[in-house]
């Protein structure tokens, strides 16, 4: 399809002509499987001593090649205005520790461009998390769109880099990182405002919180009291022990003695405290 009409029309025609084909490339069963196995999209990545540095591209190599070929073929025949760009609005990483807080170690997480041989953080977007800071949520926002090209033998795209430091004596998994993002592809690139990487420390989930509420405690005590013989908590019609003090005596408030035969004396004689079985 050749370009015709205004710029707005061209954009609409390009999107309509390419959306179905891109959908097939991005959401085929093979592409979905590659996103999970090669990129760890939505999966927990374990940081171990034998995997101290992890570089996870945001697009699988096979999928990258197919998308790049698609845009290149459209560009070569004049149907697309570029060879394609990759944009990622945000990368969100949930980081949790899997060792005790007294373990001395840290994680360094940042977003990189595979076109950079040094794998430097993009615009300084780098976050360091000590073990006792975890759990935490880390957010990255790229400041440019990545061209779909090959640099040397590397497929250029964004990647999440995780470095493990310290943790002497801990050879197993010390932290788990679960990353989520949504990659977008277009023949036009975007302009962005520079935003620093964000870090939000998260309070650990209290599994016993439900048992520490007053209602839960009351129910627990009531169930325990009900398991004991009720005779220990129900008063019979026997005369009350004279050692029991009234509330006025506990407050050291002296009341004048009531005359025998008075209405107040009869009310006092008729009063009997009651104890409810349980709470």
UniProtKB/Swiss-Prot annotation:
Role played? Transports viral genome to neighboring plant cells directly through plasmosdesmata, without any budding. The movement protein allows efficient cell to cell propagation, by bypassing the host cell wall barrier. Acts by forming a tubular structure at the host plasmodesmata, enlarging it enough to allow free passage of virion capsids.
Would I find Transport among this entry's keywords? yes
Task: Provide the residue span(s) of the region labelled Disordered.
Answer: 247-279
Lineage here is: Viruses, Riboviria, Orthornavirae, Kitrinoviricota, Alsuviricetes
List cellular component terms (GO): host cell plasmodesma
Q: Which InterPro entries match?
A: MPV
- This chain belongs to the protein called Movement protein
Q: Which residues form the signal peptide?
A: none
Keywords assigned by UniProt, alphabetized: Host cell junction, Transport, Viral movement protein
Q: Where in the cell is it found?
A: Host cell junction, Host plasmodesma
Biased composition annotated in UniProt, kind: Low complexity: 254-268
Q: What is its main location?
A: host cell
Task: Please cite one Gene Ontology biological process associated with this protein.
Answer: transport of virus in host, cell to cell
- Which family does this protein fall into? Belongs to the cucumovirus movement protein family.
Domain of life of the organism encoding this protein: Viruses
Entry keyword Transport: yes
Species this chain originates from:
Cucumber mosaic virus (strain Pepo) (CMV)
The record's listing under Pfam families reads: 3A
């Amino acid at each position: 399809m050749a370009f015709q009409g205004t710029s707005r029309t061209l954009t609409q025609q390009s999107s309509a002509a390419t959306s179905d084909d891109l959908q097939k490339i991005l959401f085929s069963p093979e592409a979905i499987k590659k996103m999970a196995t090669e990129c760890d999209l939505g999966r927990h990545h374990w940081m171990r001593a034998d995997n101290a540095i992890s570089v996870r591209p945001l697009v699988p190599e096979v999928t990258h090649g197919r998308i790049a070929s698609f845009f290149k073929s459209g560009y070569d025949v004049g149907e697309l205005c570029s060879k394609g760009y990759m944009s990622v609005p945000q990368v969100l990483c949930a980081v949790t520790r899997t060792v005790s807080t007294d373990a001395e170690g840290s994680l360094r997480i940042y977003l990189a461009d595979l076109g950079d041989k040094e794998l430097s953080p993009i615009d300084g977007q780098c976050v360091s998390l000590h073990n006792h800071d975890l759990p935490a949520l880390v957010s990255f926002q790229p400041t440019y769109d990545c061209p779909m090209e090959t640099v040397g033998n590397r497929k250029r795209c964004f990647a999440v880099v995780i470095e493990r430091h310290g943790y002497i004596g801990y050879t197993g998994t010390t932290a788990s990182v679960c990353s989520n993002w949504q990659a977008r592809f277009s023949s036009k690139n975007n302009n962005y405002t520079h935003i620093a990487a964000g870090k939000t420390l998260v309070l650990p989930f209290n599994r016993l919180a439900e048992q520490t509420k007053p209602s839960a405690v009351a129910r627990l005590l009531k169930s325990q009291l009900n398991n004991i013989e009720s005779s220990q908590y129900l008063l019979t019609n026997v005369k009350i022990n004279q050692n029991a003090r009234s509330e006025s005596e506990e407050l050291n408030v002296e009341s004048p003695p009531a005359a025998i035969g008075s209405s107040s004396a009869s009310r006092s004689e008729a009063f009997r405290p009651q104890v409810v079985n349980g709470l």
